[in-house]
A protein has these predicted regions:
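The substrate-binding groove and active-site-proximal loops of carbohydrate-active enzymes
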Residues: 89, 117-127, 158-165, 240, ...
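Oxyanion-hole/transition-state-stabilizing segment in secreted/luminal serine hydrolases
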Residues: 44, 52, 64-66, 93-129
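Substrate-gating cap/lid alpha-helix
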Residues: 156-191, 197-199
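A short helix->loop->beta-strand "cap" motif at the edges of active sites that frequently abuts
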Residues: 141-149
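N-terminal secretory targeting modules
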Residues: 1-54, 59, 65, 73-79, ...
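Charged helix-capping and loop-helix junction motifs
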Residues: 127-134, 167-171
């Protein structure tokens, strides 16, 4: 493992830069770059700080997120280190760019940990660039004194693409963004790769898969720090580290990296940003509730009360939620790069049809193999190749039947068999519309 500084000049695109291609980076544990000078300046001055942990289910675990907050608090016992849990399992930087204002910026953090390399692993390079650069520019546009730290995790399935000693593709794309904006990065998986290759660690310690990507099931501990065969068990599923093994290794990487990061950079606002690496990055996002005057709805629907059993658990992610039954139709117009709905999928999920500018609709099923429970998701409502053109979006909730039992994973089918009534309804639940651009009245 090594700590080294990047030689690429901030604000300058790499030679031959192509946003649709990936140049895989050497596997290095940390690049301090511009450091976290504003964050550390507040700590050294004895001022309270707030850290936002922004990512997917690995960040949602009681792992490196909890360990690092505790570490900072122990290092600076005379200040209050506050933490914002802004992680949602099974989601990537695309939803991250949309929900940034509600889940992170309104708390005015001093530091944002950004962890999306695993959940962005299947996203094309241009998609990662649009959302991750949008996150960076949105943070600094609203909070110029907030520092940002990219952290990378890994999974068993990503190890083959990290041969011989390169970062996985998603992290490599994020490194280019970090270079351009002088953002420090920590790859928390370097030691894990070394231990696995030397036969001292097993990535997947059980044949059991995860049935949920949220909630208490994520927070598991290994029975032993070392298995009977002498190997460290990293995770049950090869993805979500055990709290007392994999996440400890992640935290050790953070500890090793922080001294050089602390020494880097100069205090001051992240102002006068260079032009975007990609012109259509998702920097300017607006959030529109479904009862907005410019959103037209017909058919059966309601604004759910805050004690609704399905939507209540998600009120920390949106101000309100709405439910639409079969026959409901939603129409709105927008101008910009794209639009999406912040929806909930689960046992009651039905089938919706989405039409753009009156074209043949595409089908979006609000149910998947995990859906023994309800969880947040994002429903794509289309891109626009011309951000100045007004687009009309129509969402129809159909009564099309779904063979939900057939869709569920085999280990989830018993839940259907015991509770068939739980799956009978066909509904569409959503909290708001995200637009990279603006809504048109």
């Amino acid at each position: 493992m090594s700590l080294c500084a990047t030689t690429i000049e901030p604000g300058k695109l790499p030679e031959g830069f192509n946003p649709e291609k990936i140049e895989q980076r050497k596997l290095v544990e940390s690049f301090p770059r511009g450091g976290l000078p504003n964050f550390y300046a507040k700590l050294e001055a004895g001022q309270d700080v707030t850290i936002a942990y922004f990512g997917g289910s690995i960040t949602a675990q009681n792992g490196y997120r909890v360990h690092s907050q505790k570490f900072f608090q122990e290092q600076y016992p005379n200040v209050k280190v506050n933490a914002i849990h802004a992680a949602i399992g099974g989601t990537g930087s695309n939803l991250g760019a949309y929900r940034l204002e509600h889940d992170v910026l309104k708390y005015k953090p001093d530091l944002v940990f950004v962890e999306f390399a695993v959940n962005d692993s299947g996203t094309p390079p241009l998609g990662i660039r649009r959302s991750m650069e949008g996150i960076v520019r949105h943070i600094w546009g609203d909070l110029p004194n907030c520092d940002i730290l990219f952290v990378y995790t890994l999974t068993a399935s990503q190890l083959p693409q990290m041969q011989p000693d390169v970062m996985q593709r998603s992290a490599s794309v994020m490194e280019e963004i970090a270079d351009y904006y002088a953002i420090p990065t920590i790859h928390m998986g370097v030691e894990i790769v070394e231990l696995e290759r030397s036969g001292k660690l097993i990535m997947k310690a059980s044949n059991e898969g995860m049935t949920r990507v949220s909630g208490k099931e994520l927070n598991l501990s290994a029975d032993n720090f070392v298995n009977a065969d002498g190997k460290i068990p990293f995770a049950r599923d090869g993805v979500h580290p055990y709290e007392n093994t994999g996440h400890i290794l992640y935290m050790e990487a953070i500890k090793r990296s922080l001294p050089a990061i602390k020494a880097a950079g100069q205090k001051g606002p992240h102002a006068n940003l260079p032009k975007p690496m990609v012109a259509d990055c998702w920097e300017k996002v607006v959030t529109i509730p479904f009862d907005h005057p410019a959103v037209h709805i017909t058919g059966p629907w309601r604004k759910d009360p805050h004690d609704d059993p399905v939507t209540r658990p998600f009120l920390n992610r949106a101000d309100d939620f709405f439910s639409f039954d079969s026959g409901a139709e939603i129409t709105f117009k927008y101008k910009g790069v794209n639009a999406a709905a912040y929806n909930i999928i689960g046992p009651q999920g039905g089938v919706v049809e989405v039409s753009i500018d009156g074209a043949k609709p595409y089908v979006s099923r609000q149910f998947d193999p995990y859906c023994t429970y309800h969880r947040l998701a994002t429903m794509w409502l289309g891109n626009s190749t011309d951000p100045e053109k007004i687009r009309t979006i129509t969402i129809k909730v159909t009564d099309q039947p779904i063979d939900k039992r057939a869709i569920l994973f085999d280990h989830n089918k018993p839940d259907f068999d015991k509770n068939p009534a739980k799956y009978e309804k066909l509904r569409f639940f959503a909290g708001c519309i995200f637009i990279v651009g603006e809504i048109v009245e």
